[in-house]
Amino acid sequence: MRVQLLKHEIAKCMGWLFKRGLTSALSGNLSVRVDDVVYISPTKVPSYRVRAEDVSVVTMKGDHLAGRSPSSEMPTHLAIYKVTDSNAIVHAHSRFATALSCLGADLQSPDVEGKQLLGRIPLIPYARPGTSELAEAVSNGIKGFRGALLENHGLVAVGADLEGAYIVAEGIERAAQLVFDLSLFSRR
């Protein structure tokens, strides 16, 4: 994929995250790996305003090559790439997944579609956002899974490409919402 097209797709996907309610203006981020280069959403740019030229370009060692400053969650993205064969990551602070993460529970989708798409979504113990501790915890906990809940924080989803990671992120949020909905029915 050409670099400019890839950056455009990243900007467009940041807009999707906002429009679909998976992020607020300044929360959430995503990245795509191409060989040893990572294209990652910028810090301090509202998700609905990210443009292709804003996308940050970094090495797998974290050296900044181009674009705006990378997301503060860059260490976590790089750590995930080092332990998985994923080429894309979506990190979102969506309402239901974040609420479930605050309850301290893994996510098992209650519906057939969610079970097939997601499998089990583990809970990664709390670590302060943007830190090497979070990067280490996530890279240790996500191996073998399509995503994870980050305790008191949100979700992270991985995929072979950006669309795949986005679909997993949206699937995690939908599964978390179903868990919430079912809890309302079980109280009757």
Model-identified regions with their sequence ranges:
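Glycine-rich flexible loops
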Residues: 1-188
